[in-house]
Each structure stands twice: as C-alpha cells, then as structure tokens.
Amino acid sequence: MNTHNLLFSFIILFFSCGLKQKLNYSSEFIIPDQKFNNNEVRIDLDYNDEKNWAFRSDMHDFNRLIPKNYNIKNEKKINVSVFFIHPTTLFSSKKWNADTSHFLNNNIIDLCLENQASVFAGITDLYVPHYREMHIYSYTDTINGIKAFNVAYNDIEASFKYFLKNKKTDKFIIASHSQGTNHAKKLINEYIYPKVDLRSKLLMSYLIGMDINKNEMLIDLCQNPVQLNCFLNWRSFNESYY
C-alpha cells in the first residue's frame, strides 16, 4: 500500500463510528476521480419529505435504535428535543457528496444511529436528518472537500430550520459525531449564536469525535456536571487502536 492509500485508510479508521465489523479495510475504497461539480448537487433537499430523515420521533419507532436486551419502559421522558447529526458514512464513491440513493437501506447509517443516537431514543423528541454528506476523502483533498462540505452543511441548516418549526419542546440539544460535529460547529457559531432568543433555547451541545479548541466556539465550554447552555467535546479511542 502506498503512502497515499495508507493515509486514506487511516482517515477512514479515524472518522468511522465503530464500523470495523461492517467494512473491509483491506479493500481499495473508491474515491472521487474528478473535481467537485456543483451541477451534481444544485437541487435543494425538501425536509418536508419524510424520506430525507434518518429518524424522527413522530414517524419512526424508537425501539429500532435501542439495544435489544434493554427495557426502556422505566426511563423517564425528558422534555427536550434533540437534533442529531450523524458522522461520515460515505467511504466509497466517485462523487464528492452522497446522493439521495445513499439514504436508502443504508446499514452504516443505521449502525451509527444504533451506536450513538440511541441514547436519546424513546426519552426525547429526536430528529436525525439525512444529508448529502461529503466523501471521507474530503478530509484529504481539502480544495474539493470544502466545496463538498458546504453542500452538506446547507442540507444540515435546511433540516435544522425544519426542526425548529416542528420540534415539540421549547428547549433543544445539538448532538453530533465526526463530520457531524464539523457541521454542528458551523451551525452553532453562524446560525444559532447570533440569534439571542434561539441561543437561549440551546440547552446543551454534545460535539463529539472531533478536536475542538474552546476558542473555536462562541458558546462556553462546560466546566462542571450541572452547567447548561454550553458544549461538551471529547474524542476517544481504544488503547492501541492506531
């Protein structure tokens, strides 16, 4: 394996959400072989269309997300809505962004929801949008990658606007992982923070799987277990993972 492929394989390991059992890392992944083409992603996604949601509490059964041996009946429901942005699942494609066919019967997206968004399932008003995420290779080829990132972010912002209009509670939480955290950072800093009333309703932000310097965020870093209106951030690996 040459240096380029080795770096790409490391990036996949670095940004995946516990997918070691689902992916064959010894295989050669397909990466974009053309420059980013905006003509391929000109049409905006309609978040009134249920197909553009990976999970929504008002249309999906939360039991599909929780561990099969876990009894959620005794859990107290929390009066809060959650907007969860899932991590990268586009590893092998010639396109810089996922298209809507990527949303269909996607076991990797399902696994990410089961491993991560499940903590909110059944006890909150949970929204998880599909979005035209950027290819994992965008972290290597950043010239084309930033353009792909902007497409993905525009979907996130559009879905968040739908979330704001339809969520069942006043207060809300932002939660994200990996690429999702890249989008959450931008959403909080550029869309939520400038709106004082909206900012006051952001109860907590769980920005996981990416390094974040506290100076990168306009909201405060949480300093104690009971602080609200702040963000938590961590990135952890098993010992000797890489």
Functional labels for PLM-detected ranges:
Residues K20, E157-K168, E190-Y242:
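Surface cap/lid and interfacial helix-loop subdomains adjacent to catalytic sites
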Residues S176, G180:
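Gly/Ala-rich beta-loop-alpha elbow adjacent to hydrolase catalytic centers
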Residues S81-I85, Y127-H130, I173, M204-L207, ...:
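Structural recognition of the beta-strand scaffold that forms the well-ordered cores
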Residues N2, I72-E75, A117-F120, K195-D197, ...:
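A general structural signal for short secondary-structure junctions and capping/turn motifs
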Residues M1-K22:
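Bacterial Sec-dependent N-terminal signal peptides
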Residues H183-L187:
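Hydrolases whose catalytic domains are alpha/beta-hydrolase-1, hotdog thioesterase
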Residues C17-I109, L113:
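Flexible, membrane-associating and regulatory peripheral segments of lipid-active enzymes
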